[in-house]
């Protein structure tokens, strides 16, 4: 994949070249999207809109730390939707990981989560965020146990993941009605890179085959159900709904 690669560390140690080789990225000086290695982290920038700033994955500080400490925890809609109750903490495959926010929330309340991300740039951002998270003395020990990244397309990987998870979580990119400033900023940068998930409808069937209990699909409130398959079961919040579908039970 072609993207503008920028090293701002001043270290001259070739770290960016190693990273590019690992994720199959090719430097393109004229690409409007830039992957930038700073002294603090790896970030994505939209070069023709510098005011939007950089997007990076941060599990340790910022919004994610606030959500972990002061958010709803088990009471969060995503936690309710995957079925967390009492001692039951399902094993989850997040098949559209994105920036890893929902996966992190589930991991922080105790679920083991395997994140799938097919876009190599997004996977590189996630991997960078995970590395910093794993190294953190406070969250590192449990994060290493509960949150991992698999760089693969969900459309192919969903058929051969083992062991099978109890829950598959899907949050396909859907064209957003622009509301909050944050959504505007992140989505403009993000959608410039990955665009909408035009093949997302194809995820529902393999997800239901893989999950032993349920599939949860996050949708904006104005979006039709995935693959136009309606379900009466959903957790509804302001602006979103989490549609719940049955999985395929394990055969003893």
UniProtKB/Swiss-Prot annotation:
Q: Where does S-adenosyl-L-methionine bind?
A: 101-102, 117-118, 153-154, 171
Q: Give the Gene3D superfamilies listed for this entry.
A: Vaccinia Virus protein VP39 (3.40.50.150), YhiQ-like domain (3.40.1630.10)
UniProt EC number? 2.1.1.242
Query: What keywords would UniProt list here?
Result: Cytoplasm, Methyltransferase, rRNA processing, S-adenosyl-L-methionine, Transferase
Q: Does the keyword Cytoplasm apply?
A: yes
The catalytic activity, as recorded, is:
guanosine(1516) in 16S rRNA + S-adenosyl-L-methionine = N(2)-methylguanosine(1516) in 16S rRNA + S-adenosyl-L-homocysteine + H(+)
Q: Where in the cell is it found?
A: Cytoplasm
Q: Does the keyword Methyltransferase apply?
A: yes
Please give the name of this protein: Ribosomal RNA small subunit methyltransferase J
What does the similarity note say? Belongs to the methyltransferase superfamily. RsmJ family.
Q: Which parts of the chain span the membrane according to its record?
A: none
One GO location term (cellular component): cytoplasm
* HAMAP family in the cross-refs: 16SrRNA_methyltr_J
- Which InterPro entries does this chain map to? 16SrRNA_methylTrfase_J, SAM-dependent_MTases_sf
The protein's job, in short, is: Specifically methylates the guanosine in position 1516 of 16S rRNA.
* Organism expressing this protein natively: Citrobacter koseri (strain ATCC BAA-895 / CDC 4225-83 / SGSC4696)
Q: A single GO molecular function, which one? A: rRNA (guanine-N2-)-methyltransferase activity
């Amino acid at each position: 994949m072609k993207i503008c690669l920028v090293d701002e560390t001043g270290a001259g140690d070739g770290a960016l070249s190693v990273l590019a080789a690992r994720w199959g990225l090719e430097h393109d000086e004229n690409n409007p999207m830039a992957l930038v290695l700073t002294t603090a982290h790896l970030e994505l920038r939209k070069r023709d809109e510098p005011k939007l700033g950089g997007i990076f994955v941060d599990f340790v500080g910022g919004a994610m730390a606030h959500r972990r400490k002061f958010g709803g925890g088990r009471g969060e809609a995503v936690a309710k939707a995957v079925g967390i109750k009492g001692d039951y903490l399902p094993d989850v495959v997040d098949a559209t990981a994105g920036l890893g926010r929902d996966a992190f929330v589930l991991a922080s309340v105790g679920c083991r989560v395997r994140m799938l991300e097919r876009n190599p740039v997004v996977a590189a951002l996630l991997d960078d965020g995970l590395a910093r998270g794993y190294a953190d003395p406070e969250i590192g020990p449990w994060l290493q146990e509960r949150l991992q990244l698999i760089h693969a397309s969900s459309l192919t990987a969903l058929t051969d993941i083992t062991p099978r998870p109890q829950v598959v979580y899907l949050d396909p990119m859907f064209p957003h009605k622009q509301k909050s400033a944050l959504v505007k900023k992140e989505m403009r940068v993000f959608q410039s890179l990955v665009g909408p998930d035009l093949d997302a409808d194809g995820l529902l069937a393999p997800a239901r085959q893989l999950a032993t209990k349920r599939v949860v699909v996050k949708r904006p409130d104005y979006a039709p159900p995935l693959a136009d398959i309606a379900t009466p079961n959903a957790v509804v919040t302001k602006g979103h709904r989490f549609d719940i579908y049955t999985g395929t039970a394990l055969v003893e």
